Amino acid sequence: MKPNARRLARSLAVQGVYSWQVSKNPIGDIEQQLLLEQNTKHLDVGYFQDILRGVAVNHPVLDEAVKPFLDRPFEEIDLVEKAILRVSAYELKYRLDVPYK
């Protein structure tokens, strides 16, 4: 899989996490809707699914992991920023195959 496919998966995962935070809909419904709307030809679908599901399951742990590095209370972080932080923290904590850059 090309690195670009992972970048697209990561971007779609951030959209999915944001949608989940706003709507409170089941993560499976959000995943299904995003995959229906997206051209998956150049997307690493498995990576997208792992991130999206992983963030939904592990968000309390991820939130606690990033809190010490914030300059304001976690509750004051914008939902877009929270989605990015959660996806990033998930990759750093659980996706050991992602190289550090």
Regions found by a protein language model. Name each.
Residues 1-101:
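N-terminal interaction/assembly modules
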